């Protein structure tokens, strides 16, 4: 069965698992360019949005939680936007990617058996800086915390019930000591998640 576990160190794979792979990127526009450059550096191919080509990997970047004083002071509209950004849109992207990896799978679940594909959701980073209050961290953990069971539950279904090799992984950047998230570490993690050994787990990586 798929185990969910959390790790604080960046898993390394000596092999370049992104070489020759077709990658779809979506999400926060401020990150897309740097991710595309890092994927190209590893000889991966970032597919244009309208491309019909089959992908091996779908990466969705949620972007970070915007600045606000208290969750309880948000308007309904502001709250709905956050729910869309961190729950509804990642879920929709995941659903579309799974449909692309397993065409017709929703009508015939047998098609999932042995199908392959990777979906990586990069969630909101913890705040960076030396004097970050617990209150600031807690606001972000509300959304990071909502994403963890989503990835785990989808993986259990894909692995245990449908017997497929399609996996959804969640990366939660940032450190509790307030250091800036490192994009290279995130790319090393994605490279590892493309490896065969990663498919036996549902890793939630800090």
State the predicted function of each range.
Residues 14, 61-89, 94, 98-162, ...:
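Catalytic loop of short-chain dehydrogenase/reductase
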Residues 1-44, 56, 67, 80, ...:
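Non-catalytic terminal and boundary segments that flank Rossmann-like NAD(P)-dependent oxidoreductase
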Residues 164-166, 170-206:
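C-terminal helical subdomain
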Residues 44-51:
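Interaction modules related to DNA damage response and DNA replication/repair
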Residues 55-56, 117:
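Conserved acidic residues
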Residues 4, 8, 88, 92, ...:
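Short, contiguous clusters of charged residues that form electrostatic/catalytic patches at enzyme active sites
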Residues 24, 118-120, 167-169:
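A structural signal for isolated positions on well-ordered beta-strands in alpha/beta enzyme cores
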């Amino acid at each position: 069965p798929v185990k969910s576990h959390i790790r604080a160190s960046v898993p390394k794979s000596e092999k370049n698992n992104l070489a020759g792979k077709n990658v779809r990127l979506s999400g926060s526009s401020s990150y897309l360019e740097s991710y595309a450059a890092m994927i190209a550096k590893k000889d991966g191919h970032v597919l244009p949005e309208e491309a019909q080509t089959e992908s091996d990997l779908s990466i969705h970047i949620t972007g970070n939680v915007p600045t606000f004083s208290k969750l309880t002071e948000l308007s309904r509209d502001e709250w709905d936007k956050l729910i869309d950004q961190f729950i509804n849109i990642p879920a929709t992207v995941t659903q579309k990617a799974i449909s692309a990896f397993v065409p017709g799978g929703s009508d015939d679940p047998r098609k999932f058996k042995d199908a392959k594909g990777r979906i990586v959701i990069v969630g909101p980073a913890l705040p960076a800086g030396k004097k970050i209050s617990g209150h600031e961290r807690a606001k972000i953990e509300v959304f990071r915390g909502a994403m963890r069971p989503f990835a785990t539950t989808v993986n259990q279904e894909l692995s245990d019930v449908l017997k497929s090799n399609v996996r959804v992984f969640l990366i939660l950047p940032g450190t509790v000591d307030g250091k800036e998230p490192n994009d290279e570490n995130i790319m090393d993690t994605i490279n590892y998640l493309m490896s065969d050994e990663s498919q036996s787990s549902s890793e939630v990586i800090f």
